[in-house]
Amino acid sequence: MSCRLVFSMLVVPIVSICLFAQGVQPYPNAITDRQFYAKTPMAPPPANTVFQDPDLGASMVRVTDGNTNPKEPNDFFLNPDSDVNEWSMDDSKFYVVAGGNGANLAFAFNPTTMTVSALPGAGVGGGLVIPLREGPTFSVLDPDLMYGTAQEAPLTISTYRFSTGKTVPLVDTTTCGTQPPLVKGPKQSSSDTTVSSDDNRIVISAGANSAGHRPFVIVYDQKLGCRWYNTQTGQIGGQWGPTGQVSIPDRYNVNHVKISGNGQYVRIGVARVGFYIWDVTSLNIEPCPVQDVGLRCSGYGAVGYDAYINGPEVLDELNAFLRPLGDLGDMTQLINPLPQPYYKGMEKSWAWTNGVLNGNVPVCGSTYSPVGNEEVKQPYDGEVFCIETDGVASTIWRFAHNRAVWNPKFYWSQPYGSISLDGRFFSFSSSWDLQLGTFWGDSPRSDVWIVKLD
């Protein structure tokens, strides 16, 4: 932890992160007790109206409504995967996903007033269509820049610059020398674009036509070139680093990938199995299977600068563990000692993209009922929260009720969240207690909401 602290204080330009590393509380106005706060019935406010959560007190704004995507009237909206940078590094821009056609829609944001507005070139509805495939990510260093894969060339890693409106290819991954060769075609695509804290390394999963079937993890270093790992054959190759067979016999398909802030590790998610950590400077792959009770690998998680956080449902729903990506068995319990009574019954998703800069900043998330119960019956039910990670204390900050109602038939009903790189704003999707209407028959709409974390 101390190494990450020294690194962050020397090079991270974001003021709030440095202040927390020096002992200043990041969220002085947030509730930190364990009292129960009932959820006050509340109609959904109009879009772009700032309001206060009536129970936990945070300022919020609704981003989208049924008119946000004119090409799909009454569309639903959700956050991108919490691994990507949904926010520009200066909080001036963010994007959401339009569920009907999968468009990435970017908006301007005023962090002082929490006003959402249209970017230059945006059409009716206010959302600027980002011409990249699903899951693009903002640069960690440049608020004008995004990384992703090209719409017409899904195996080409590209950049998009807002000021010019231009998409520029960085590398065609079919030229990376993968074995067997990646070949362009209608059944070959990619996803999961994430970047290291210096923007130098970019990772995607590639091959096949959907997540869960992809065989390749490709890391592109803007100075050294490509490096790849075929998860179905165990072969690693590329233009830098050692090549050969991986250190384990496991063979599998890739669900999702995420690169660490320091650029050394890639978390490779595998459906119903768990995940693997690849040290990209080596042939070393470390498995974290969900069936290994001792490793506590289950539950949603988040990758930071050089560490991983997850909540494996041990004793208490918020009982989270931090571990170095280079040693998954070296776990630190974030809430220690764990207070009683223990609370159970909530699932949770995590957001820690700001952790790619500094592993000491709080990890944030949202809780929701896995059976779609709209009621809140105990502390932390259906809330937006953050947990301290620096080891000094075990503070839990509480901000708002997210009013999401999970239904496994509709993936967008889960309150996936994303946090800004300075840790000041948390965005999430919610049906607002099923009050946003329906589309495509009886499918519940969801919109995107922003909470100010202070």
Region spans (language model):
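Hydrophobic beta-strand positions that form the internal "hydrophobic ladder"
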Residues: 94-95, 145-146, 202, 266, ...
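Blade-level signature of beta-propeller repeat domains, shared across WD40, Kelch, NHL, RCC1
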Residues: 411-454
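Blade-loop segments of beta-propeller domains
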Residues: 73-84, 90-149
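Asp-box/WD-like beta-propeller blade repeats and closely related beta-sheet repeat scaffolds
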Residues: 121-210, 230-243
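Blade/loop signatures of beta-propeller domains
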Residues: 26-62, 66
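Structural signature of eukaryotic scaffold interfaces centered on beta-propeller domains
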Residues: 77-90, 127-143, 185-198, 249-262, ...
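Loop/turn-rich, solvent-exposed surfaces of beta-rich toroidal or solenoidal domains
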Residues: 315-323, 332-404
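Structural motif
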Residues: 102-108, 153-161, 210-219, 271-279, ...
